[in-house]
Structures are given as structure tokens and as C-alpha cells.
Regions:
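N-terminal active-site beta-alpha-beta segment that forms phosphate/nucleotide-binding
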Residues: 1-78
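Short, Lys/Arg-enriched charge-dense amphipathic segments
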Residues: 48-57, 76-78, 110, 125-129, ...
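A conserved C-terminal secondary-structure "cap"
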Residues: 220, 228-257
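Generic hydrophobic, helix-prone segments enriched in Leu/Val/Ile
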Residues: 38-39, 187, 245
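Structural signal for hydrophobic packing residues in well-ordered secondary-structure cores
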Residues: 21, 25, 41, 45, ...
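Conserved phosphate- and dinucleotide-binding cores of soluble alpha/beta proteins
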Residues: 2, 65-233, 237
Length: 257
């Protein structure tokens, strides 16, 4: 499938994100698009992937796409079912989570995320859901993958509030603060994919999706992005990935359309 008309933007985001999980042992999943991503990866590039859900489920192998982190299908065949406290304390904070997905209303060039407020904190224009466990996940998971739609209002020079830390002062700064995780490593949007510079911690354009130009990317963010010397076109979803998404994981198109 090479024609963008053959697949949706969400299907491309999901497929591109799932490929980043090749060889990963376990992943803190979450809800929404990451839920579809991880279940697709488990059926393609990472068949041994252990799906970890915030509700206390480790090693989920759901027979269908779970509707939430509390969906009963997650319990069937799971490696372990524990409490949310134990999952965070003895798995996440112990450094046993390889990859976790996060998203947000805003992200900056260093991968810091805002899920708290839009506007002034004391008198916000919009009050968002908040951190939940995102701050702890951002600090303690070995790697963070971010998946979100790209727009100038969400890719901002300065966050209205920093909920979950990225590489705020560079990679060495993060390590000096005692954070056990490596922070964000990749961002996947509906326009492009990004990775983070190992020294500066700054987001770097890695690939652009089929039909997307650099001008499209630049117009959808609040700063001049770093561009990798080997920037390329994002590989489109394969026929098998699309079949799994449309027939197995999300036949109703709740997340993929």
C-alpha cells in the first residue's frame, strides 16, 4: 500500500508506532491509539510482547481490542494480575518497564508534555485530565514513545504547564536528577516521525509521511525543527497490517478512521 488514499492517517500512525516495538519485551500500554499500537505489534513485529496495563495487569494477551484499562478481556491469559500500587511500585519504579506510551495536549522540542491546563494554571481556559500516572511513567520507564496529532497549538515553543518531563535540560541533566528512565525516544504524529538527539535531547525530524512536505511539518509546530541528515519517507502500512487493523483489532473503525 503506497497510495495515502488507501489508508487513514491514524492507520499510518499506528503502523509506524507498532514497528518501534520490534524486539521489546514489555510495554506500558494505556488507552486510545497506544492500545491499538501494542496489540498490532503483538500480532506482527513483537509476538512475545508483554502488555502492561495501569489497572494492574501484566502480560495481557487479549482476544479482542480492550475498551479500557479495566476491560475484563485483559485478565484472560494474563501473566499476572496485581494492584495498581504494586504495578507502579514494584514494576515501573523498579525499572522493569521497557517502553511506555504517552500523549498530551502540548509537547515542546524536548519532549516535555502538558496534560494539565491550557492557559494560566490558576485560571485556565481549559482544565485537562491531569497527570494520572504519566509523570511517574515519564521518569521511570526505560523509553517513552509519544503518539499524538501534530498542530501548531500542540507542538509549542513553551508549554502552558509541564506535567510529564522530557529532556528539559538535556540528557545528562536528566540522569543527574536521578531519573531511572531514558526519557522520550520517539514521537509519531499524523505528519511525521521524530527521534531525540542523544546529546541535546532535542526532537529531530526523522521521516515524513507520504504526501507530506517539510513546509507542512514546519507550519504545524511552534519552532524550527532539527532535521536528521538521513530524513526519509515513512513506510506506509502493509496489507497485513491493514488487514489486522480492519478485520481483527478495530473492525468498527473506532480508532483507525
Amino acid at each position: 500500500m503506497s497510495d495515502p488514499a488507501d489508508y487513514s492517517k491514524n492507520e499510518l500512525m499506528i503502523a509506524a508506532s507498532a514497528r518501534l516495538l520490534a524486539g521489546v519485551e514489555n510495554c506500558f500500554v494505556g488507552v486510545g491509539l497506544p492500545n491499538v499500537v501494542c496489540n498490532l505489534a503483538q500480532r506482527t513485529v513483537a509476538p512475545e510482547l508483554q502488555l502492561v496495563y495501569e489497572s494492574g495487569v501484566f502480560g495481557a494477551r487479549p482476544r479482542r481490542l480492550p475498551l479500557s484499562i479495566g476491560d475484563p478481556t485483559l485478565a484472560t491469559g494474563a501473566t499476572a494480575i496485581t494492584s495498581m500500587f504494586e504495578l507502579f511500585a514494584f514494576y515501573l519504579q523498579a525499572g522493569l518497564i521497557d517502553v511506555a506510551f504517552l500523549g498530551g495536549a502540548q509537547i515542546d522540542r524536548f519532549g516535555n508534555l502538558n496534560t494539565t491546563v491550557i492557559g494560566d494554571y490558576a485560571q485556565p481556559r481549559v482544565r485537562l485530565p491531569g497527570s494520572g500516572g504519566a509523570c511517574e511513567i515519564a521518569i521511570h520507564a526505560k523509553k517513552i514513545l509519544v503518539i499524538m496529532r501534530q498542530a501548531e497549538r500542540s507542538f509549542v515553543e513553551k508549554l502552558h504547564f509541564r506535567t510529564s518531563p522530557g529532556h528539559s535540560g538535556g540528557v545528562e541533566h536528566d540522569r543527574a536528577r536521578g531519573w531511572s528512565g531514558s526519557g522520550p525516544t520517539n514521537v509519531v504524529t499524523d505528519l511525521a516521525t521524530y527521534r531525540f538527539d542523544e546529546e541535546t535531547g532535542e526532537m529531530t525530524l526523522g521521516t515524513m509521511h507520504p504526501g507530506v512536505s517539510f513546509d507542512d511539518v514546519r507550519a504545524s509546530m511552534g519552532w524550527e525543527p532539527r532535521v536528521a541528515p538521513d530524513v526519509a519517507e515513512t513506510p506506509p502500512p502493509t496489507d497485513e497490517e491493514l488487514r489486522l487493523l480492519r478485520e481483527d483489532l478495530d473492525p468498527a473503525g473506532i480508532y483507525t478512521k
